[in-house]
Amino acid sequence: HAHGDHVGNAVELAIRDDATIITGSELAGYLQSKGAKTIPTGIGGSKDLEYIKVKFTQAIHSSSINDNGTIIYGGLATGILITAEGKTIFHAGDTGLFSDMKLIGEFNKIDISILPIGDNFTMGIDDSIIAAKWLGAKQNVPMHYNTFPIVKQDPNEWLDKLNKAGMNGLIMNYGDEIEV
């Protein structure tokens, strides 16, 4: 979605690496106006790329860009299902808990779900546990916490609650890798 902590230097990286950014249509248009190659999408839309398939889902969150003091609407925030080699990862994006996560879990065999736990701007620990239950992933990974004081959370508390609810979780640090 179109917040600075997500857009970051995506345009510069895309230009440098001759990469294409796939994102919601409003944000795609903005990034394209800055020189990036994009593939615009929408919620519910999927795209088969060379090695992967992506499908965008709803996320409940704001989405705007501050472009030199002007606030620009960035389209709807999204989550994304990424499928490659028969494995599916669900990145929930910045979101609150919403009941259609049940449908995402019902219609997709999710190997790994990546869920926010930071609270304040996204769901917190307890709602993330509910989301994990609804999604039914084999493995869950927390995200969007401890980047700013306002989203300080204890990921071990999340992991304990997740395990007590009978689900698997993994706390990852920068540079960690996981086998899907």
Q: What residues fall within each predicted segment?
A:
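Divalent metal-coordination and catalytic microenvironments
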Residues: H1, N9, I21, V54, ...
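Di-metal (Zn2+ and/or Mg2+/Mn2+) metal-binding site signature of metallo-dependent hydrolases
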Residues: H1-D17, G24-E26, Y30
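Histidine-centered active-site/metal-ligand motif
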Residues: H1-H6, H61, H91, H144
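Hydrophobic packing residues within well-ordered alpha-helices of enzyme cores
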Residues: A10-L13, L31, M101-I104, W158
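Short active-site oxyanion
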Residues: I15-T20, K87-I89
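Binuclear metal-ion centers of metallo-dependent hydrolases, dominated by the metallo-beta-lactamase
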Residues: T20, Q32-S46, I129, K133-V180
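Core dinuclear metal-dependent hydrolase active-site scaffold
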Residues: T41-G105, N173-V180
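Metallo-beta-lactamase
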Residues: T78-L135, M143, T147-P149
